[in-house]
Amino acid sequence: METVYCGVDLHYRSSTFRFLDSSGKTKQAIEIRTDREEIENLLESYQNCNVAYAFEAGNMARYFHRLIESRRNTQKIHVVHPRKFKVITESKHKNDKEDSMKLATGLLKDYLPNPVYIKSEICRQIKSLLNLRRRMVGTRMKIILQAKSLLRGLGIKGSQRSLAGKRGFARAINQLDSETFYKEIIETLAAEALKETGKITSIEQQIKELVDQRFKLEYEWLVSIPGISFVTAATILSVIDDIARFERAGQFSSYCGLIPSEHSSGEKTIHGRITKEGVKELRTLLIQAAWSIARWRKCSDERLARLKKKFYRMSCKQKNTQKAVTAIARHLSRIVFGVLKSKTPYCGVIANRAEACSS
């Protein structure tokens, strides 16, 4: 069966397809609406051929990937990182037809950059629920801050944490018997905050159910690590999907965007700021976990004690706590990798220096 190489330049309204045969000759170049029916009609004309696809990662990539991954004649799917394919990014003649041609040619001649990993459907679902939860937490926080501002204006003191639950709002409302107008406002805000809390609880339950379907053991291993909470563990699992795609701990740390950038020339090496690649939410949560470790008064094991000493040593030497906590977060990412790769719960005992470095 003949193999056809298809380069696709995807956009929201219309997309450009370029089909090449094994000799590199164009069989078809066409622009169609990015519509399921039109795409399927076009691909049906190649049902007697094996088709290899190449397209850039983006908002429409997931949609197109779901359309073609279940087709019987799909031979290969290569999702290209937009910034790493220099043939397109540095081209002086950039348009949809040229881009689709370069993608198809790169696929045929095998000079495309390493493909972008496409996560499983359950990981996408967990990630969507985590994004929804984060938005709801932000909404609840705004409500609590508004209530706190009103109460302070009335001379009623209370911490932000005290208003996080039903009892905290009830105590505040009981102090407003003489302020009927403001009492009604606080009652309304309390009802909204509690409503958001209920939504968050429901979302967390859905996340836990999805995690248990696919990552039950992995989740238990992750939450055994000090500083790793339910949300952090679920985020890690939704982002990495399969730890086997990382060969070394350094690769995982790099994926989290926690390694310093490097500029080397000859014998001169300069390390700059962290790369900040990968998923921002994962990096943020690991840094938050690192802060919690740094602030613990008593460390429960030897490994945490070393991390805490490292934090204070770097803070005093460089006078930069942000760099120090980022270093702890990077070490924490290596621990996460070690736990998932070895398929064992966290262990705080360090047998030797080599083991400490491999964690």
Q: Locations of the language-model features?
A:
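Low-complexity, acidic/Ser/Thr- and charged residue-rich accessory regions of DNA metabolism proteins
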Residues: E267, K310-S359
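A short, charged helix-loop
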Residues: A104-S128, G168-T180
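Gly/Thr-rich phosphate-binding beta-strand-loop-beta motif of the actin/hexokinase/Hsp70
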Residues: E2-D21, L103
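Short alpha-helix plus adjacent loop in nuclease-associated cores
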Residues: V79-P115, K268-E277
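Conserved DEDDh/DEDDy metal-dependent 3′-5′ exonuclease domain
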Residues: N41-I88
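Phosphate-backbone recognition surface of nucleic-acid-processing proteins
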Residues: W221-S224, F230, I236-K317, C357
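Nucleic-acid-processing active sites and adjacent nucleic-acid-binding tracks
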Residues: K25-C49
